[in-house]
Amino acid sequence: MTACIVGWAHSRFGKLEGETLENLIVKVATDALDHAGIGPDEVDEIVLGHFNAGFSAQDFTASLVLQADDRLRFKPVTRVENACATGSAAVRQGIRAIDANAARIVLVVGAEQMTTTPGPEIGKNLLKASYLPEDGETPAGFAGVFGKIAQAYFQRYGDQSDALAMIAAKNHKNGVDNPYAQMRKDFGYEFCRQESEKNPFVAGPLKRTDCSLVSDGAAALILADTATALKMRRAVAFRANEHVQDFLPMSKRDILTFEGCEQAWNRALKSAGVTLDDLSFVETHDCFTIAELIEYEAMGLAKPGEGAKLALEGTTAKDGRLPVNPSGGLKAKGHPIGATGVSMHVLTAMQLVGEAGGIQVPGAKLGGIFNMGGAAVANYVSILDRIR
């Protein structure tokens, strides 16, 4: 692969009062160009990741990126969508443009504004990332979908509530030191483990602390070909970038194995010529704690049904053998859908150049990313390596 990350920007995630989707997009696009030291006239292509699905009345959003600078006018811009993996779909589109020699420098932006939407509509919008004939009437929205997955996992492998609480507590603890995170509070294991008025059950065995947040936010990357990147201030290369798409209906697959996730990881590791033991850390898609648990198994870190051991033994803690979600993950950082995949790449690049501040993994050399759309339907894995 020839694409490298040479600059980035990241907004705070959360309920951003007074912000608009346009402002979020413009700010990160401008800041990313400045961070890379790239002029708008040097950009060859632009990709915007924006899920929307009813969150914004402005559905045609591609050209909002051009508002960042008049010199971007007439540049080709494409908006992409692939459910909660929309951001990674945008990143991949940019990589492919560079790998095909169709572009030298690509601006990638991911953004979403969700918190201005009334609560009941949020659930309906998110369910659009499921197979509606089967799941369209699921109570509790997408939490209900993953509640069913968690219940099925418990039935097959036993009650895993201790492990889910440990995952939630880990990610909240990590998120305290992330300045971009929506929820910077260490709730602790006991709070996450116990049902309470402040932590009620939401769907099946999933409590509030098992669910990611509804968020506003944006992130951006500047991608460049390797020759250009090596002349820049910094360069983080894609050792691998893989995309695997699975069936949408859960009835057509074993939903407890996340086979698309497994396939994407296998292909990425083979492409990069590395193993999980070579990775310094992983940012993975913890839309719900049960998702992170199953992802441990799908990526090959644990055998089926044994992912809980990793959480309970501290293997995936920040000081563990393979830190998972040192950023706090979607659980603490927030999950503005179109921005999430781009954010994961920004924060991984920051780790690799030693600019991650309080969430820095000491000596990070190689970072893995898994971003998922739907219930393991759209699956993206990147492996990043600093080369400058």
Regions found by a protein language model. Name each.
Residues 41-50, 76-82, 106-110, 162-169, ...:
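Beta-strand segments within the central parallel beta-sheet cores of soluble alpha/beta enzyme folds
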Residues 81-112, 144-178, 221-227, 333-356:
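Active-site-proximal alpha-helical scaffold in enzymes
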Residues 53-61, 250-254, 286-309, 320, ...:
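Short glycine/threonine-rich loop-to-helix capping motif typified by GTGT followed
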